[in-house]
Amino acid sequence: MDPHSLTLTAAAEGAHLRAAASAAADGLFDDLPEPRAVVLITNESRARLAAEAVIALAADARAPITIARSLPRFVGALDLVFVLTDDPGDPIAEVLAEADRRGAATVLVDPGEGPVRAAASSRTVVVPRPAMSAVGSFCGYVGAVLGALTAARVTALGPAAVLDDVADAVDAEAVACAPDRDLLVNPARQWAEWMRGHSVVVAGEGDVWRTVAELAAAWLLDAGLPAHGTTVSDMLRASGALAPSPAAALDDLFHDPLIDGPVDGGRMLPLSVIAVTSPADAPAVRARLEPFEWARVECPAEEVEVRHPLVDVCVTAARVAAAAAYVPEEG
C-alpha cells in the first residue's frame, strides 16, 4: 500500500468508529435478540484480528463468541451472526444468506455495493461505512461488533456513549499525527523514525495486546518494513537470539548493510522491538524491557483523559496506522 493510501486509511479510523457509534445511538441494533451463541464470520486477516480483540475485550460476555470462515452447523434461529469483510464480492455472501435462511439474526458491516450487500435480507442489520471509505477498519469492526453485542445484552462494553468517546479520542490522535505536524510534535512520525531501516518485532502481553501487536506488524508490512507481531513473553524468551551481536554493534561509518551485506554474519537489518500496552500495564512492561536498549514501550492512551479498554486499544491502533504511513518517508 502506498504512503498516501496508508495515510488516508489511518485518518479514517475515527470515522469508522463514529459510524458504529451513530448506528448504536440511532437504535440500529435495538431489535437484536439476546443470542444463544455469537459467530463472527470473516476471511480477512485485519477483520479476524478485530474479532479476536472483541473476544478478548468482552470478558463479561453472556454468550459464547466464536470466529469462523464458514457457517458452523449448529447455527440456527437462536444465534447471532456477524459478517465482516472489506470485499463487496467476497464469497462470504453465501454464508450471510445461509445464516438468514436458518433464522439466525445477522449483522453486516457494509463492504459497499456488491454481492455481499445483496445477500443481506430485510432482517439483516447493515452497519454503514463512512462515505469515501474504500476499505473497512480494525477500529470500525471492533466498534460495530461491540455496539451490536451491547444492544443484544451479550456485553456491557460498547454502549453508544462509550463508542462516541472512543471515536473522539481516535480523532484527537489523528490530529496529533496529521501530516502537517513535523517530527518534533508528531508522535507517529517519531515512532516511524525509530523503526525506519530496522526489522521490527511488535509485542503485546495478553490476548488483547497480542492482536494489536499483530495489527501493527500487518500495517508495517504494508509500508514495506519487515515486521512480526507476538507476545511480550515470547519476545523475552527469544531475547538471547534477538539481541544484536557484539560484532554487529561495532559502528563502521562506511558499512552499508544493504550494499555490503551483514556485518560478520549478522542480520541484514538491525532489530527494534516495540511493546504496545495499556496505561495500567505500562509500568510493568517498561520494567520488563528496561534491560534492552533496542526495545521501547509505546502507550498512546497514556495521553488520553478517558480511561476505557476500548480507548486504549483503538487509540493505539490509530497511532500504529499513522506511524506505518510515515515509515516510507526519508529520515
Language model regions located:
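A generic structural motif
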Residues: I65-L71, V109-P111, L225-A238, W294-R307
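Conserved active-site and cofactor/substrate-binding residues in soluble primary-metabolism enzymes
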Residues: A12, L49, G136, G140, ...
